[in-house]
Amino acid sequence: MLEVKNLTAIRDERILFESLSFEIHAGELVQIEGRNGTGKTTLLRIIAGLGECECGEILWQRSKIQSDRESYHQDLLFLGHQTGIKRELTALENLRFYLAVHQQTVDDPAIFEALAKVGLAGREDVPVAQLSAGQQRRVALARLWLSKKPLWILDEPLTAIDKQGVSVLEALFLSHAQQGGIVILTTHQDMFADNPKLRKIRLGDPK
């Protein structure tokens, strides 16, 4: 379970959100909504332990994330606006590197399959620097098919993804939640239309 307690964030003398509290349980799929500038990215970064807040706390499995960041990040997959991939490596090498850093053992056929899922079949050995921005983001998204982490925090994961790709990712997010994981995301795309499994948390306008 993830708990957000009395969270307040101020940026450039604006209160983005104040005394924000909610809980997210295993098996939940949550979309953070709000107009541009309401603090969606700020909130995700704070929850991921990558941003600061004026007051409040985040608890994961009833422990404050600040007290054991290493353990928390072992359970967390965060995908932000920056893809975190290495341009000098190929798509295949990037995923091998990611898995090694996170001490996961996955064979190459599974990596090839993950890249195929995001539409990069045949591009596995191309240096990332030669891929388009959308293709580079797909390399980062391929991690989702390989991850064993229970908590996914995804900031605009559908940027530059076509309609078919959105459908594939939507199915993956639902599957992760059905298996007891948690997905927290922001998106401007119309996903999960009328899906009862989706919970929405809306941020108000800054003060």
From Swiss-Prot:
SUPFAM superfamilies: P-loop containing nucleoside triphosphate hydrolases (SSF52540)
Protein EC: 7.6.2.5
Listed PROSITE patterns: ABC_TRANSPORTER_1, ABC_TRANSPORTER_2, CCMA
Keywords tagged on the record: ATP-binding, Cell inner membrane, Cell membrane, Cytochrome c-type biogenesis, Membrane, Nucleotide-binding, Translocase, Transport
ABC transporter domain mapped to chain residues: 2-204
Pfam families, sorted: ABC_tran
List of residues binding ATP: 34-41
Keyword set includes Transcription: no
InterPro entries named in the record: AAA+_ATPase, ABC_transporter-like_ATP-bd, ABC_transporter-like_CS, ABC_transptr_haem_export_CcmA, P-loop_NTPase
Top EC class for this record: translocase
SMART domains (alphabetical): AAA
Lipid bilayer topology: Peripheral membrane protein
Cellular localization per UniProt: Cell inner membrane
One GO term describing the cellular component: plasma membrane
Top-level taxonomic group: Bacteria
Chief location: membrane
GO molecular function: ABC-type heme transporter activity; ATP binding; ATP hydrolysis activity
GO biological process, one term: cytochrome complex assembly
Reactions performed catalytically: heme b(in) + ATP + H2O = heme b(out) + ADP + phosphate + H(+)
Described purpose of this protein according to its UniProt entry: Part of the ABC transporter complex CcmAB involved in the biogenesis of c-type cytochromes; once thought to export heme, this seems not to be the case, but its exact role is uncertain. Responsible for energy coupling to the transport system.
Similarity field: Belongs to the ABC transporter superfamily. CcmA exporter (TC 3.A.1.107) family.
Subunit structure comment from the entry: The complex is composed of two ATP-binding proteins (CcmA) and two transmembrane proteins (CcmB).
Matching PANTHER family: ABC TRANSPORTER I FAMILY MEMBER 1 (PTHR43499:SF1)
Protein's recorded name: Cytochrome c biogenesis ATP-binding export protein CcmA
Lineage of origin: Bacteria, Pseudomonadati, Pseudomonadota, Gammaproteobacteria, Vibrionales
Gene, per the UniProt record: ccmA
